[in-house]
Swiss-Prot record:
The keyword Zinc-finger does not apply. Involved in nucleotide metabolism via production of dUMP, the immediate precursor of thymidine nucleotides, and decreases the intracellular concentration of dUTP so that uracil cannot be incorporated into DNA. It comes from Antonospora locustae. It catalyses: dUTP + H2O = dUMP + diphosphate + H(+). This is Deoxyuridine 5'-triphosphate nucleotidohydrolase. GO terms for biological process: dUMP biosynthetic process; dUTP catabolic process. Belongs to the dUTPase family. Pfam families: dUTPase. The lineage of its organism: Eukaryota, Fungi, Fungi incertae sedis, Microsporidia, Antonospora.
């Protein structure tokens, strides 16, 4: 049985988050207002929805890759903690040279719900070696 995340429209014409492809990890978030984000401007945009996240997960808001790539738009990650109810807003910054126009109903960000680790952390004096070791950031190459 899957978790239930409850969503309330704050306005009858607000759009609830939707996954646009089968198996997608993220739900798209829609702007509830028309606005313009000027170059080098940061703005908070309402979505018109409120979400309650179950105790077993957290919701995190991310950029949509296409907007980031095409328009130099960055979304600052807003977190909705376990058991928290929050009006969903998108904290957006325009790194581009042109104004970024947002129309009501545009998909401006995405939210991912992440299952939480419920275990305990234990401090140790040494860590076991792993196959990957301390490698990361590009250590596996591109081919």
């Amino acid at each position: 049985m899957s978790e239930i995340i409850t969503v309330k429209r704050l306005f009858s014409d607000a759009k609830i988050p939707v996954r646009h492809s089968e198996g997608a990890a993220a739900y798209d978030l829609y702007a509830y207002e028309d606005t313009v984000v000027a170059p080098n401007e940061r703005k908070v945009i309402a979505t018109g929805v409120r979400i309650t996240v179950p105790l077993s997960c957290q919701g995190t808001i991310y950029s949509r890759s296409g907007l980031a790539l095409k328009y130099c738009i960055e979304i600052f990650g807003v977190n909705i903690g376990p058991g928290e109810t929050k009006d969903i807003v998108v904290d957006i910054y325009n790194h581009g040279k042109m104004p970024f126009n947002v129309a009501k109903g545009d998909r401006i960000a995405q939210i991912v719900f992440i299952k939480l680790f419920g275990g305990d952390l234990h401090e140790v004096s040494e860590l076991s070696d792993t196959k990957r070791g301390s490698c990361g950031w590009g250590s596996t190459g591109i081919s």
